[in-house]
């Protein structure tokens, strides 16, 4: 499994929190001190907590679970989509639509609407419409695509949320809490830890730090999927061998009746 060191975090600037006057007292256990007016996050706490979170993701994915990456602010958007796409997981990186999980049926309808418009563009339907109608449809398509691209192939609710900036993504966390979905979250010094099951104390604004978190998660997920595939292959071979052994007749069964009774005559 991927391991992130204190040096990795330090070099990415993960230790820089927010201005002290904006702090959330619930983050006090994870704050080392202040540099000027900036809170400094205790990376000695972050390292084991991040690795615990990665272990959790590995266990979930190893058992066939799905992780949804969530990070919609500008500094996180690209990193979220790239990391999630690389490890084959759903993501939300533009805007969290209210009810994206708690009203998933409606979201699926929106995805079908997006697919319907795309089909219209491809099958020649646009050619039969007025220019104004095409413009309206294209605007709708662009709006839906921005919000839904990362979850288009998601048929079921995720098993875990991996969130960058839990304050910015508070609605997503509230929905996860309602549904009992565990949350792994990067929590800066100004945010509330409520609803976050696996806390990763760290800078949630630095692009470099964000890439470190999400790439570590993606690497962990890829390794877990590969390990699960190997286990599945091994199990498949064992099951096949067992099935064959059950179907094959014993040596005595293969012998003619008049010889079966004498099969051990040379022992």
From Swiss-Prot:
Residues 250-267 have a biased composition (Acidic residues). Signal peptide: none annotated. The gene is rpsB. Keywords: Ribonucleoprotein, Ribosomal protein. The keyword Ribonucleoprotein applies. Belongs to the universal ribosomal protein uS2 family. Residues 234-267 are annotated as: Disordered. PROSITE patterns: RIBOSOMAL_S2_1, RIBOSOMAL_S2_2. One of its GO terms (molecular function) is structural constituent of ribosome. PANTHER family: 30S RIBOSOMAL PROTEIN S2 PROKARYOTIC AND ORGANELLAR (PTHR12534), SMALL RIBOSOMAL SUBUNIT PROTEIN US2M (PTHR12534:SF0). NCBIfam families: rpsB_bact. The lineage of its organism: Bacteria, Pseudomonadati, Pseudomonadota, Gammaproteobacteria, Cardiobacteriales. The keyword Ribonucleoprotein applies. GO terms for biological process: translation. Pfam families: Ribosomal_S2. GO terms for cellular component: cytosolic small ribosomal subunit. It comes from the Bacteria. This is Small ribosomal subunit protein uS2.
């Amino acid at each position: 499994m991927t391991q992130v060191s204190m040096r990795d975090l330090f070099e990415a600037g993960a230790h820089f929190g927010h201005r002290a006057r904006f702090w959330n007292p619930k983050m006090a256990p994870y704050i080392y001190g202040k540099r000027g007016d900036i809170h400094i996050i205790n990376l000695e706490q972050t390292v084991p907590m991040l690795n615990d979170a990665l272990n959790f993701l590995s266990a979930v994915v190893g058992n066939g679970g799905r992780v949804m990456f969530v990070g919609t602010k500008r500094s996180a958007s690209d990193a979220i989509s790239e990391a999630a796409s690389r490890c084959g997981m759903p993501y939300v990186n533009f805007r969290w639509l209210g009810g994206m999980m708690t009203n998933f049926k409606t979201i699926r309808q929106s995805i079908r609407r997006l697919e319907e418009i795309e089909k219209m563009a491809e099958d020649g339907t646009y050619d039969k419409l007025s220019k104004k109608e095409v413009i309206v449809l294209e605007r709708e398509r662009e709006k839906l695509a921005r919000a839904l691209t990362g979850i288009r192939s998601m048929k079921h609710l995720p098993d875990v949320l991996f969130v960058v900036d839990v304050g910015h993504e508070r609605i997503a966390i509230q929905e996860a809490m309602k549904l009992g979905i565990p949350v792994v979250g990067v929590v800066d010094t100004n945010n509330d830890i409520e609803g976050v099951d696996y806390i990763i104390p760290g800078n949630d604004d630095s692009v470099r730090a964000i890439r470190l978190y999400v790439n570590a998660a993606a690497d962990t997920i890829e390794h877990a999927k590969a390990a699960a595939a190997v286990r599945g292959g091994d199990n498949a071979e064992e099951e096949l061998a067992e099935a064959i052994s059950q179907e094959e007749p014993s040596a005595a069964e293969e012998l003619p009746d008049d010889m079966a009774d004498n099969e051990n005559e040379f022992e």
